[in-house]
Amino acid sequence: ARQGIRSPLPQIGSRPHISIAVFDRVDPARVRPELEELAATLAPLPLTFGAVGTFPAKEGVVFLTPVVTPELLELHQSLHARLDALGLRALEHYRPGRWVPHCTVAIDLPREQVIPALEICRCSRVFGSLMLAEIGLVEYRPVRPIYSFPLRELRLES
């Protein structure tokens, strides 16, 4: 609530994340094996936030953008390939070639709070390194975590 700017994210139970696919509806039981298998094949991904931005939408959204790496794009592409094979197609702006990776830090801001929120982010210490450590399914509005799986390296049997 710095400088009078409030985002409902903490109140609705949201935590920092990067959405790699969004659906109007999806059966959690159908997606679970794919996410679990994908998580078992991936090491945690190092990420660095490189920019702060906003979407050209009616509701005020402020986000951090990670530096796009081959590993992040591979995770995104791999998940979509798995879900496409099940006949599950994500919303178009989350599809490969259209996706803008981002970590939302504020939503539903009044127009006059967007610029101050961008400035707060720009001057903060959020631009260091971090790790993408898990993949999961979350219901949104209201936020309800369904399940998540830690990313870990695939260990070959010797």
Regions found by a protein language model. Give the residues of each.
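Hydrophobic, well-structured mid-protein blocks that either form specific transmembrane helices
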Residues: 37-67
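Basic, often amphipathic N-terminal segments
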Residues: 1-46, 71-129, 146-158
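Short proline/glycine- and acidic-rich turn/helix-capping motifs at secondary-structure junctions
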Residues: 50-59, 96-98, 134-144
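Short, structured patches in soluble enzyme cores that scaffold and shape functional sites
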Residues: 22, 68, 107, 134-139
